[in-house]
Amino acid sequence: MGFFDKLKKITSNLFSGFTEADEDFFEELEETLIMADLGVDAATDAVEKLRTKVRKEHLQSQEAVREGLREILMAEMEVGDTAMKLDTKPSVCIFIGVNGVGKTTSIGKIAASLKKQGKRVMLCAADTFRAAASDQLEIWAERAGCEIVRQYEGADPGAVLFDALQAAKARNVDVVLCDTAGRLHNKANLMAELAKLSKIIDRECPGCDRETLLVLDATTGQNGLIQARTFKETAGLTGIVLTKLDGTAKGGIVIAIARELGVPVKFAGVGEGIDDLKPFDARSYVEAII
């Protein structure tokens, strides 16, 4: 079953039985959106906006109502540029997120994509706490054909990033992709660690383009938002990488993220292959689910 086919089937069933935009239709739509992981507030708000739109614009046909819903959901996701800004040399992208969400794998896939675009990419193994994290990243560096800077397990992450930035400047690298520890659930520790990395970037690459991407597992649904709020408060996020979207029917989490965090989804993981982390396109996403 393809990308969002389950969710598409649910919404298609709803619209295939459509006769008019009456109260029964709106109640069923709200329930469908909640089940799709938009969250209660987002689902209720979307349905209320659709009610108003149907009334004001006299929408009657199934397709007119469906397109009205698409427009509402699209508007929810207009929270920032979905493209990465990596124009300076080097640019730096920090990846954050808890263990098990596919952070290291996402870095490898993005590295491979940038390499195909002709960029010279370096990976920085600053997750020095998780056993074999650097080994895993090194495997991805080999697959993607990228350089990697790493140290011993338990090394200071800031020192690893410093070494990577020095090497990147010396070797004319375009983009540094930096893995970080996923175990820092304590907000104070997380803030201190990220602030330290940020200061090193400020000092070694002043004025460079910088991205801070939070990697989230889509299958965790609304629970993922709890993680995301903590990281948003501490990290100054520029975007989200949403993994394992192919493993869930609950694609509404994309809209919930945009609504609650005001941060765009920049990449969506739709499979295990090296090319299966795709730049996120909001229009294609909405048309895929509605």
Regions found by a protein language model. Name each.
Residues 181-183:
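Short glycine-rich anion-binding loops that position phosphate/pyrophosphate groups of nucleotides
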Residues 1-4:
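Compositionally biased, charge-rich terminal segments
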Residues 156-171, 185-290:
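Conserved catalytic-core segment of NTP-binding enzymes
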Residues 101-108, 131-133, 223-225, 248-252:
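Short glycine/serine/threonine-rich phosphate/pyrophosphate-binding segments
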Residues 96-97, 179, 215, 269:
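Short beta-strand segments
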Residues 6-126, 133-178:
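Primarily NTPase-proximal linker/entry elements flanking Walker-type ATP/GTP-binding cores
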Residues 23, 44, 59, 63, ...:
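Non-catalytic, surface-exposed connector residues within folded enzymatic/regulatory domains
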